[in-house]
């Protein structure tokens, strides 16, 4: 449901595979194709057309396998794509994966793509209406079966099997973690990065290895996420409209919140 793109490695070689029995064509990495086709029990095939690098497929357009979505899916370059297994064409959903999101943001920052990030899962781990009526309300785990059935119904399912792989779990409760792209508040250090690095150089560290550790951390630091989904901590004095979601944060609102908290404590915010 969240698929928006297909990632390919720009340096790998890709070919069209012609399934002679079904008269269908599939785009795959040349090295991975034999194993992938064997997994799908496809034996009667041939390579068609010329070989192309992943870079040559950049921004090529495909359609989402579920026709009801009527969604154009673009091909993006991604160095995270490997030859370990699969087809060399990786499902990419910026709303539900760090690599996926960073690959898309690179294209957005370069002005090559500008699309809304789709995230059809709510904060309780259930599919939203954006996923379609046949999935709405189901947990992400409950949605697996209907999703596979929908692919089969569309004639887009070549094969299926279970895989054992590592998966992120919460370090506290040990439950599996669902990745979601959500709006957060970030602090940028770009305006004072050089000053901070200069201060590190002017500081004597004991032990001396502390210099390189702190210097490298500041040098490579990206925007810092300062917001948390917690009921405790220091609140961010931003006010949101329940209707449109727009926010208001000005020197005046910050000063007003400050005065109230000074008088009543942080519980006043709650």
Predicted features by range, described:
Residues 1-2, 14-20, 56-61, 68-72, ...:
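Residue patterns forming the tRNA-binding/recognition surfaces of aminoacyl-tRNA synthetases
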Residues 11-64, 257, 266:
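Carboxylate/His-rich catalytic cores and anion/metal-binding grooves
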Residues 6-9:
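Phosphate-backbone binding and catalysis cores of DNA-processing enzymes
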Residues 24-26, 71-74:
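Short beta-strand segments
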């Amino acid at each position: 449901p969240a698929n928006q793109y297909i990632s390919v490695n720009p340096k790998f070689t890709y070919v069209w595979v012609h399934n002679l029995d079904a008269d269908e064509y599939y785009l795959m990495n040349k090295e991975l194709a034999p194993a992938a086709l064997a997994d799908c029990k496809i034996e009667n095939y041939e390579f068609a057309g010329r070989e192309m690098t992943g870079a040559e497929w950049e921004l090529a357009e495909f359609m989402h396998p579920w026709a009801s979505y009527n969604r154009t899916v673009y091909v993006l370059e991604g160095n995270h794509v490997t030859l370990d297994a699969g087809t060399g064409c990786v499902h990419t959903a910026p709303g539900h994966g760090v690599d996926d999101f960073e690959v898309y943001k690179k294209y957005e920052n370069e002005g090559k793509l500008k699309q809304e990030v789709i995230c059809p899962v709510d904060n309780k781990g259930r599919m939203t209406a954006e996923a379609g009526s046949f999935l709405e309300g189901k947990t992400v785990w409950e949605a697996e079966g209907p999703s596979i059935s929908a692919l089969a119904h569309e004639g887009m399912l070549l094969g299926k099997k279970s895989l054992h792989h590592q998966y992120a779990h919460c370090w506290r409760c040990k439950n599996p973690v669902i990745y979601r792209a959500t709006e957060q508040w970030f602090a940028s250090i770009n305006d004072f990065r050089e000053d901070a690095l200069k201060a590190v150089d002017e500081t004597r560290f004991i032990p001396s290895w502390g210099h390189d550790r702190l210097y490298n951390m500041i040098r490579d630091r990206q925007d810092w996420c300062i917001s948390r989904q917690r009921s405790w901590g220091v609140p961010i004095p931003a006010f949101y409209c329940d209707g449109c979601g727009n926010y208001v944060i000005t020197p005046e609102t910050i000063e007003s919140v400050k005065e109230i908290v000074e008088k009543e404590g942080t519980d006043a915010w709650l």
